[in-house]
């Protein structure tokens, strides 16, 4: 008689799971209450807690729950206590008043399998190594002085993007521009030139003719979107650790696959960069600086190659996906609200004219366009839920007891749609930021009504770069082209696709018509 090993295995798994479930259920029933005065929230179920309530769009589900339970609510997600802040006052309490207590992040499957076991800057433990990584980025890439130093790179790469779009618009039958691909093309090469001193990505159709390219932009864009999607998923194993090894959703498997692809790409970049190091001896780029940091002890800390790769992964993914998604949403809103696009064109024509490209120095003189950017950050924040934080110690927030090791989620999407803060929050109305009430609100983390980059000491390190890139690239696209939908398309599909970054479910395609002289579309 033969024995079916696979059947025995699954029966064993089922038996162990049943035992653990029964054990946990009994503990749940008879465990004494030490809840003090926790924030209100849904009860959930034994073992799984409130996980099923999150659905496929957790930011929307959590916003709906906050209407019932309040702006500070407590959920048990599996075995993990989680507090959710859903209005500006609650966000300020956690991200400013109690910022130090929530300065670390939980180490889950995402940081483990995608970010080299949290050896990057985004997920690293709050401490000396995180501070060194952040300092290096600020000094050489993301700080105000660094942004000035590489402003010419931004102008040049936007020029390459405009050239590609102009060529597509000039064909006998204009080809619709796939907006996210063009944005990734510009932003990834912008970051590549700062880090590597070269343009690592090309339009897919031109890959064979480019000897220096590391990858096609469409391939890279797919990898970035997959990584950001997976990193935003609620993995059951993160919240019920004793079944994590089963990988019931297949998320860990998929994370390992996409991380391997990035690792191959990053290793290739570093190898090629090392081989040409002598050419940059007198003018080192950011990767040269990082590699030097692996050979020296800086402030008692020494980086290693894993830290370098993990940081490059942060910069190439977050540096392209978050800003490009905001720009895509803004263009989608303007295509659905033609009067907003027309008013932006009128303002730009009055201030800039139509004989040259927009410059960064023009933006302060374009208040209506700036209002469009802010309104997009409000309604379509690049990160709908902040990356989770975790409390180091128990604390009291607004009269509620928050236990030690409680996860914190700030629902940035819900804050931007809070009807107590924003009149008609579901409408796309840039004019609201021209009123005295909201005119001085800035998206860089100081006004908790609008925190698309987060706030506090773990605010997005690229907030300054992200805000400036959105303004400059979106402004250039609006000023340089007229925009219309492809034939047969009446309205832009505005459905969301959830992840760390909030993408459009259907990528935006549009027909563009040049508004400036042909010389404006050359590099």
UniProtKB/Swiss-Prot annotation:
Record carries keyword Metal-binding: yes
InterPro entries in UniProt: Cyt_P450, Cyt_P450_CS, Cyt_P450_E_grp-I, Cyt_P450_sf
Catalytic activity: a 3',5'-unsubstituted flavanone + 2 reduced [NADPH--hemoprotein reductase] + 2 O2 = a 3',5'-dihydroxyflavanone + 2 oxidized [NADPH--hemoprotein reductase] + 2 H2O + 2 H(+)
EC class: oxidoreductase
PROSITE patterns reported for this sequence: CYTOCHROME_P450
Top-rank lineage group of the source organism: Eukaryota
One GO BP annotation of this record: anthocyanin-containing compound biosynthetic process
Gene3D superfamilies to which the protein is assigned, alphabetical: Cytochrome P450 (1.10.630.10)
Enzyme Commission number(s) from the entry: 1.14.14.81
Cofactor: heme
Molecular function in Gene Ontology: flavonoid 3',5'-hydroxylase activity; heme binding; iron ion binding
Binding annotation for heme: 460
A Pfam family the protein falls into: p450
Keywords: Heme, Iron, Metal-binding, Monooxygenase, NADP, Oxidoreductase
Biochemical pathway: Pigment biosynthesis; anthocyanin biosynthesis
Recorded family membership: Belongs to the cytochrome P450 family.
Function in brief: Catalyzes the 3'5'-hydroxylation of naringenin and eriodictyol to form 5,7,3,'4',5'-pentahydroxyflavanone and 3',5'-hydroxylation of dihydrokaempferol and dihydroquercetin to form dihydromyricetin.
Protein name listed in UniProt: Flavonoid 3',5'-hydroxylase
Organism: Campanula medium (Canterbury bells)
């Amino acid at each position: 008689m033969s024995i079916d090993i696979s059947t025995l295995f699954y029966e064993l798994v089922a038996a162990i799971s049943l035992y653990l479930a029964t054990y946990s259920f009994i503990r749940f029933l008879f465990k004494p209450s030490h809840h003090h005065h926790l924030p209100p929230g849904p009860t959930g179920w034994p073992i799984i807690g409130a996980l099923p309530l999150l659905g496929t769009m957790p930011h929307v589900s959590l916003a709906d729950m906050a209407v019932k339970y309040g702006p500070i609510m407590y959920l048990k997600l599996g075995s993990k206590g989680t507090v959710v802040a859903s209005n500006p006052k609650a966000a300020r309490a956690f991200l400013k008043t109690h910022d130090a207590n929530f300065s670390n992040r939980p180490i889950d499957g995402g940081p483990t399998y995608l970010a080299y076991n949290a050896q990057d800057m985004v997920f690293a433990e709050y401490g000396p190594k995180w501070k060194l990584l952040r300092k290096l980025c600020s000094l050489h890439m993301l700080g105000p002085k660094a942004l000035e130093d590489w402003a010419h790179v931004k102008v040049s790469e936007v020029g390459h993007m405009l050239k590609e779009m102009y060529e597509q618009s000039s064909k006998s039958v204009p080809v619709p521009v796939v907006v996210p691909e063009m944005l990734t093309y510009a932003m990834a090469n912008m970051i590549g030139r700062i880090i590597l001193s070269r343009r690592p990505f090309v339009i897919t159709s031109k890959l064979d003719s480019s000897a220096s390219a590391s990858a096609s932009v469409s391939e890279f864009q797919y990898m970035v979107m997959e990584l950001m999607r997976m990193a935003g998923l609620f993995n059951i194993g993160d919240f019920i650790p004793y079944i994590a090894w089963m990988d019931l959703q297949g998320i860990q498997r998929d994370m390992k696959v996409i991380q391997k692809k990035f690792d191959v790409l990053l290793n290739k970049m570093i190898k090629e960069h090392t081989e040409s190091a002598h050419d940059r001896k007198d003018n080192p780029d950011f990767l040269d600086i990082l590699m030097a940091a692996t050979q020296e002890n800086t402030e008692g800390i020494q980086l290693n190659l894993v830290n370098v790769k993990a940081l490059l992964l942060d910069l190439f993914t977050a540096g392209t996906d978050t800003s490009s998604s905001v720009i895509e949403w803004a263009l989608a809103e303007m295509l659905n609200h033609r009067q907003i696009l027309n008013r932006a064109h009128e303002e730009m024509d009055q201030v800039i004219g139509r004989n040259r490209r927009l410059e960064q120095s023009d933006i302060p003189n374009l208040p209506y366009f700036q209002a469009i950017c802010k309104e997009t950050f409000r309604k379509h924040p690049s990160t709908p839920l902040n990356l989770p934080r975790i409390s180091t110690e128990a604390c009291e927030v607004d009269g509620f007891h928050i236990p030690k090791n409680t996860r914190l989620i700030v629902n940035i999407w819900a804050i931007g749609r809070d009807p107590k803060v924003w009149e008609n929050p579901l409408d796309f109305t840039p004019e609201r930021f021209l009123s005295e009430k909201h005119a001085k609100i800035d998206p860089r983390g100081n006004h908790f009504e609008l925190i698309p980059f987060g706030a506090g000491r773990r605010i997005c390190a690229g907030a300054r770069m992200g805000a400036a890139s959105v303004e400059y690239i979106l402004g250039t696209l609006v000023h340089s082209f007229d925009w219309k939908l492809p034939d047969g398309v009446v309205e832009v599909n505005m459905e969301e696709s959830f992840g760390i970054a909030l993408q459009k479910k259907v990528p935006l395609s549009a027909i563009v018509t040049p508004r400036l002289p042909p010389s404006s579309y050359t590099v």
